[in-house]
Amino acid sequence: MEIMPTPSGSGPSGAPEPHRVEAGLGAAWWGESWRIFVAAPGAWIGMVVVFAVVSTLLFFIPAVGGILQSVLTPVFAGGVMLGCHALARGERLTVGHLFEGFQGGRLAPLLVLGFIWLAILVGLAIVAVAFAYVALGASGVSALMALGADAQADYVTLTPLLLSAGVAFLVIAMICVTVVLLAAMAYWFAPALVVLNGEPPVSALRKSFDASLRNIGAFLLYSVIYIGLAIVASIPAGLGWLVLGPMVAGSCYAGWRTIFGPPADSRPAPG
């Protein structure tokens, strides 16, 4: 079974400017991710289980658990990208690749990336709350709180407010989805660019966003497929994520290889 060869010219000297690729590659990356998964399914599933256990333990640390979870996620993601890169070079994938982001000079830039990502998440939450408050107004928020607390509230009086609130929340939801997509565009390739190209964190976020924007068709097609796969993977008690989790990693690596590799490599290798 053939996996994408390692793109020539990749290394710690920095990533080239991203290429424009066909929109259809957004689907092809998922096909390539399956080949990456079946090349070492045991190691991939082991990484998912270990990551889930570590994330759960971090979450239950008082006060700082959630922060640590968000900050360390790019560190683990960097290790996974190194694992994908090892497979592309014909090397053996192990669960230990999950922790390679903690080694050498990789940890500091990945932690910086994690703190930036945490700031983005906090900013998104603040923006969502602010939009809700502005859309409804202080009196509207108070009225909705009263409705939740008082079963005898005047529903006739509150009906127009509830209707306007529904429209406002729909608009807010659309804005939030747009902002989340923009954030995802900046983060998509960032861990790979840090560990595989030696990009500084801010530069990695910029190049990832630029790559996504230049290839918005592929990015949107990729995202739509991801949503469908995520729904299916979540149905059997979330067990499908044992496969989809590694496929997400593999698809990110495939996207990095085609967009930041040499133009001649802009298509996945046949399986």
Regions found by a protein language model. Give the residues of each.
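Membrane-interface interhelical loops and short interface/amphipathic helices
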Residues: 135-159
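Selective recognition of hydrophobic, aromatic-rich stretches within alpha-helical transmembrane segments
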Residues: 2-18, 61-96, 122-139, 161-199, ...
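Interfacial aromatic "cap" segments that immediately flank transmembrane helices
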Residues: 23-54, 92-123, 160-175, 182-234, ...
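Residue-level recognition of pore/gate-forming positions within transmembrane alpha-helices
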Residues: 51-52, 56, 70, 74-75, ...
